């Protein structure tokens, strides 16, 4: 008997290649569906998979068929409605059930298909969600490239020192080798033992045949025992390799207004923006630190859980958060070694005399040392003094960006606008 071992990478997922091709082919339609679906999710359910629907017209394949024009003479068996030279009306398209999108009027005729719906995984969802996004102005810190390497596990190797030997992997290889080398002999041994048992109970006794079988069985057992328990071919050693440390270190400051003017709906939109930002950073970069700052009249550095779930509130002094950020930067993040980013979310309501101070802190202390500072204002009201002060900063500093969010549907487009990957010419 011949044995086939399937060593293909996608042996259990044979449609993976076709699935990836489908995702590439209909990426535009899938991304459009994802951008619509993300606004319908709860704050805590942003990073799960998604059911994606694509209009049937977008996935229809071109096909060759006979046109409806011209004159043709045909004979169709079983016809009891028409005779020769009758004219057949062209079928009416569009009907009521043609598209399945639920946008048309009811109709008594017409045919169609529902939109094509399929499920994408969490990884596929996040890849498409954050495609073409990047931290702006990310630069490599040159002195971080000098002789900084870190040892990483890199699988197993057949050569190495005894101290790195992997006992478990070596024994697994030994068992596999012995099983493969003795499989045929063991099957033959089992057949001979069965035959010997049958002959030993037969009448009259077949002594010569029984002796021959015993001799062959002994020879097979000897051959099986000769296969070494462990061989140098089986040995596997833990492999290590040195990889250079990432030369770009980055820190993201998240500044969220939690004052009394921020109602629950506004806070939820701010949290949704920051959850998108957190997923984007953790998905795209491996060595980005995040500093969370909540503020009302006073600012406080908090952990991730308190940032998203704390109920503390109060008045509004935005400059308190900017002062705290400046202190943390000076204490922990040297601009010569770190790429510093900040994302600030507020409803724009601030003590009037404090807005010029915010302008001064940003212009003199923060914007000269950060790579990129983004400000989103979540409000349906008219802009106030903070927005106007920040407009002056945007006109002066290239690394300052500001966007306005009115409704939940604006969050993802604004997020993509703020972190759209720059072209080579723009980044230069």
From Swiss-Prot:
Disordered, as annotated region: 78-111
Top-level taxon of origin: Bacteria
Record field: compositional bias (Gly residues): 92-103
Pfam families according to UniProt: DUF444 (PF04285)
Segments of skewed composition (Basic and acidic residues): 78-90
Homology family: Belongs to the UPF0229 family.
PANTHER family referenced in this protein's UniProt entry, alphabetically: UPF0229 PROTEIN YEAH (PTHR30510:SF2)
Name of the protein in question: UPF0229 protein YeaH
């Amino acid at each position: 008997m011949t044995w086939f071992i399937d060593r293909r990478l996608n042996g259990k997922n044979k449609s993976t290649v076709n699935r990836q091709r489908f995702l590439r082919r209909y990426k535009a339609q899938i991304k459009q569906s994802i951008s619509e679906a993300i606004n319908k999710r709860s704050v805590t359910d942003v990073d799960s998979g998604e059911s994606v629907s694509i209009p049937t017209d977008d996935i229809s394949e071109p096909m060759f068929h006979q046109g409806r024009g011209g004159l043709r003479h045909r004979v169709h068996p079983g016809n009891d409605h028409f005779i020769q030279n009758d004219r057949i009306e062209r079928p009416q398209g569009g009907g009521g059930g043609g598209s399945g999108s639920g946008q048309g009027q009811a109709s008594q005729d017409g045919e169609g298909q529902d939109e094509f719906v399929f499920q994408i995984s969490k990884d596929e969802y996040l890849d498409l969600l954050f495609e073409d996004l990047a931290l702006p102005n990310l630069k490599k810190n040159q002195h971080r490239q000098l002789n900084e390497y870190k040892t990483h596990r890199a699988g197993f190797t057949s050569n190495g020192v005894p101290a790195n030997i992997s006992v478990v992997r070596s024994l697994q290889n030994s068992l596999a080798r012995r099983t493969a080398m003795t499989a045929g002999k063991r099957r033959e041994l089992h057949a001979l033992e069965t035959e010997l048992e049958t002959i030993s109970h037969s009448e009259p006794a077949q002594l010569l045949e029984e002796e021959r079988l015993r001799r062959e069985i002994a020879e097979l057992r000897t051959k099986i025992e000769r296969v070494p328990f462990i061989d140098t071919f089986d040995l596997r050693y833990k492999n290590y390799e040195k990889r250079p440390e990432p030369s770009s270190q980055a820190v993201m400051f998240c500044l969220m207004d939690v004052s009394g003017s921020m109602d629950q709906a506004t806070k939820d939109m701010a949290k949704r923006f920051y959850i998108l930002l957190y997923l984007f950073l953790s998905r795209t970069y491996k060595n980005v630190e995040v500093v969370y700052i909540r503020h009302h009249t006073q600012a406080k550095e908090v952990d991730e859980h308190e940032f998203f779930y704390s109920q503390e509130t109060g008045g509004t002094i935005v400059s308190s958060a900017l002062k705290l950020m400046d202190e943390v930067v000076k204490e922990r993040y040297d601009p010569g070694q770190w790429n510093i980013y900040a994302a600030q979310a507020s409803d724009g309501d601030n003590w009037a005399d404090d807005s010029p101070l915010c302008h001064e802190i940003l212009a003199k202390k923060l914007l000269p040392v950060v790579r990129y500072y983004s400000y989103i204002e979540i409000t349906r009201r008219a802009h106030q003094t903070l927005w106007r002060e920040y407009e002056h900063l945007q006109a002066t500093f290239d690394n300052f960006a500001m966007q306005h969010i009115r409704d939940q549907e604006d969050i993802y487009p604004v997020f993509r606008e703020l972190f759209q990957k720059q072209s080579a010419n723009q980044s230069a």
